[in-house]
Amino acid sequence: SSSLTPGHIKSDLEQLSNHYVREIPVTELFPIRDRNYSGSTSTLNILNLAYYPSERGPYNFNPNIDVNGHLTNPTGTWGGMMRKLDTNDFQTANIEYIEFWMLDPFIYSNRLPNANQYGGDFYINLGEVSEDVLKDGKKFYESGMPVDGSHSWTTTQWGKIPTQSTITYAFATSKGSRAKQDVGFNGLTDEEEQQFASYQNFLTAARANTNQAVFDSIWADPANDDYHYFRGSDWDAKQASILERYKRINNPQGNSPDNDNNNERYDTSYKTTPDVEDINQDYTLNEYEKYYQYHISIRPQDLVVGQNFIVDKRVASAPLRKGGSEPVTWYQFRIPLEEFQKRVGNISDFTSIRFMRIFLTGFAKPIVLRFGTFDLV
């Protein structure tokens, strides 16, 4: 909470006490940690994974949606992210485990009669994973999109791809150029998406299946890749919740606005560099899928010490903004690297682990995973 916090959130002590958005003090998870050492903070930096399995993610053109625009088979969908790793030779670095502390994700749903419907699966991939986000065998980078009206691009089933060679990942600085380049991984503006040939089957299905208000929102951004900062006068006007405000924070189109494209009095950019299909910034497109896969069951009945890679748990007293406290449980997972669920592709050791990919699938209901730590040890 600060002077920048919208009034409707600042006064909503119930929401600020919700275990899946509240600040978490260091002492909740680490009660004996020394708070006096240099650089210490009073709250933990939490990795939050909010997954809404019935909602379309960016570039999801599945036509099987209901009248509200929700996917009709949520357990068959997935959501994930991937990152480069700075340490690649695990054997030399003596890295033997994936280790993390996770807050019980079923604090509220366990009180419901359909509690068993809230579980699913969490997967971790370590090794080589494809950087080709929109799979077409071509590297997309926003800064390659032309700003001079030239035709230095080609098309794939997803959209436009720049054809000029990569020199650097930096936006053009001429007036009006940002709107032409900060367009997301498909290289298309919203208006171009509305007319793009391979999107028409989806748009036809959406028009037939949804009500008018839902279709209007789909039509406004067919690829569903538009970015929205977590602050915004429109968010404030509708009194959006904390979780809702972050639903579009990772979308690529418009996430690096310049002053010409910012309608607020404050900076709304998520980043200042172009989105590229090159996670480790080596100017090449890695298309290999060679990795070890690890599986963790995220179900109430499987959160048991001694099973499912859980080695410890901690019941803590969580202070609440509305007053008082509630007991919550944190679980420590420690996954031996040698105990992978399966091996994909030609990988035989842990000497060149360049990427990590994590994803959730098999969920029927929304879920928020909160990680107090996430380490390779």
Identify what each model region corresponds to.
Residues 2-95, 101-377:
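Interaction/scaffold regions that mediate signaling and macromolecular assembly across diverse proteins
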